[in-house]
Amino acid sequence: MNLPAAHIERIRDLGYTDSEARFLYIVAVFSGYFTLGQFRLFTGSAYGKRPTSFAQKLLKQGHATVRDYMRRGSIYHLFSRTVYGQIEKDNLRNRKKHSFDFMRTRLVLLDFILANQELAYFETEQDKVSFFSEQLGVSKDFLPAKVYEGSSRTQPTIRYFVDKFPLFLASPVSGAPPVVTLSYVDSGFETPSHFVSHSVLPASS
């Protein structure tokens, strides 16, 4: 994963260390939610001053909120427009409040990202659409999409890859050229029908 140095520097300008800034960038782009356990995993730190100081800094500056997570700890939501604005992604839905199932899915998704940092991820909807339509020549008609109806005065909006699950380049076997890989993240509460509807989206769009 290649994190843009300019964006990391801008997050550092808000008072964060380099490792904190890199972690916050990953959270902002891919999840919006995280636990201090995930922060400790990313930074290689133990329980104690470092994660506590990081959490206090986030809350004091109003960059995140915290809530109880299934009575097993706390879950943090990085919501501040200031942070997202520093990386030119203040329109991401990760900033918004979501259901518990959504948060759980995003935590599982972040676990995957942190465990596979060597992969080349497509960060945004536009990155994904551009890769398929411009580099691979795939018509947008065949991309997974959802139509959002507007008001009587506005046109419907078509959004692509709305699940925002990780999409990345990876080699199927050692030494082979990388291929684009789509993923599905199960929060643990989904029904089989949800996976089926997800898996057939590309064919039905």
Question: What residue ranges belong to the model's regions?
Answer:
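Exposed, interaction-prone assembly regions rather than primary DNA-binding/catalytic cores
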Residues: S99-H194
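Conserved Walker B catalytic segment
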Residues: V196-L201
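Short, amphipathic alpha-helical interaction segments positioned at domain boundaries
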Residues: S80-L107
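Nucleic-acid nuclease catalytic cores
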Residues: S205
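Glycine-rich, often proline-containing surface loops adjacent to acidic residues and nearby aromatics
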Residues: Y33-T35, Q86-N94, G175-S183
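Detector for Asparagine
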Residues: N2, N91-N94, N116
